[in-house]
A protein has these predicted regions:
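Short, structured protein-protein interaction patches enriched in aromatics and acidic/basic residues
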Residues: 40-63
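Non-Sec secretion/translocation targeting segments of pathogen effectors
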Residues: 124-128, 136, 140-154
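Short, extreme N-terminal segment that most often corresponds to the first beta-strand
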Residues: 1-14, 18, 152
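Extended coiled-coil/helical scaffolds and adjacent low-complexity linkers that mediate multimerization
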Residues: 87-123
Length: 154
């Protein structure tokens, strides 16, 4: 079955998972839980005990207004829905959810509210891309000889 695999700290990728319960459990590292947070015919399959096991927090689930209502812990994948079983994730939905989950997230609690901070996406060459790339890699924006942070807008 073709799925979109989403691992903590990594960009999502297309994967092939075998049929039956055991391959599904292996993909998420334990008992599975299927949730249906979207109007599209997709299931999000995660580890049912991921939070209790202390698995790394992965991605936030948001409501229609963009507010976080849950955070998935550990690996999860998205697959299609058949009449009575899970199926291949169609190519258009694969791309839609790849874009939605493209950036790994870190989570912080500020004033009692949990915020998701999108992380830069490594390029295929292993370089960080995005506006903060130069700063994070110590390029033109970084620390000067005295150890002070400098660069555009800093």
């Amino acid at each position: 079955m073709k799925v979109l695999m989403v691992e903590p700290g990594k960009v999502p990728y297309a994967a092939e998972i075998g049929e039956g319960l055991e391959p599904l459990q292996a993909a998420v590292g334990g008992d599975i839980q299927a949730v249906y947070p979207y109007d599209d015919p997709v299931a999000l399959i995660c580890n049912e005990e991921g939070k209790y096991m202390g698995l790394p927090l992965n991605r936030a689930l948001r409501d229609d207004e963009g507010n976080i209502y849950d955070i998935v812990a550990g690996n999860f994948f998205l697959c299609g829905l058949g009449e009575e079983d899970f199926t291949d994730l169609p190519a258009d939905l694969m791309e839609k959810y790849r874009q939605q989950f493209e950036h790994p997230e870190q989570f912080v609690r500020i004033a009692g509210k949990i915020l998701a901070v999108k992380q830069p996406v490594p390029s295929p060459e292993g370089r960080i891309s995005g506006d903060r790339a130069l700063f994070l890699q110590g390029g033109a924006a970084g620390r000067n000889a005295a150890g002070r942070v400098h660069g555009p807008g800093l």
